[in-house]
Regions:
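Nucleotidyltransferase catalytic core that binds NTPs
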Residues: 1-162
Length: 162
């Protein structure tokens, strides 16, 4: 590509367009969410595994304010929402990227009615937000075991100690 907007930018979907754009995705539609602040191997592996569970993958990102409310530190997120969205959208495994400013993605999950809801292995299925709603519609909820134990918080600790 020479100049112009990269094609992956088209995957960035404002929340108010999610329901309509979800209809155009091949199914089953998989949904996951998180901060994805400093992308690492654990993130990309989990996203690739999530995508393998269906025909498309929607990733919902916490807004910057939502990340701050999680208590990860005043300097988090390191990367602003627009940058995190672009990096996630550039991944081959990702079909759409959206965001939520609430403490949980429950409203987005209800709006886009995914067929499969996924979180990383640190989330037991019974604690995954939206699990009851997805299961009630006949969908599946999966907790994907970590293949590569990585942590953004640990990476930041290591960087700060240098």
């Amino acid at each position: 590509m020479q100049g112009g907007t990269p094609a992956f930018e088209a995957k960035i979907c404002p929340p108010d367009e999610l329901t309509a754009r979800r209809r155009a995705l091949p199914g089953p539609v998989v949904f996951t969410n998180g901060c994805f602040d400093i992308l690492h191997r654990g993130h990309v592996t989990c996203l690739a595994q999530a995508r393998a569970l269906g025909g498309s993958l929607i990733v919902a990102l916490n807004t910057d304010a939502s990340v701050k409310r999680q208590g990860k530190g005043e300097d988090r997120p390191v990367n602003a929402l627009e940058d995190r969205a672009a990096v996630i959208a550039a991944l081959e495994s990702v079909s759409l990227v959206t965001w939520f400013d609430t403490d949980t993605p429950l409203d987005l999950i209800k709006a886009c009615t995914p067929d499969v809801l996924v979180k990383g292995g640190d989330w037991p299925v019974e604690r995954i937000v939206g699990a009851a709603e997805v299961l009630a519609r006949g969908g599946r909820v999966e907790s994907i075991a970590f293949e590569h134990e990585r942590s953004t918080t640990s990476l930041l600790r290591k960087i700060r100690s240098l």
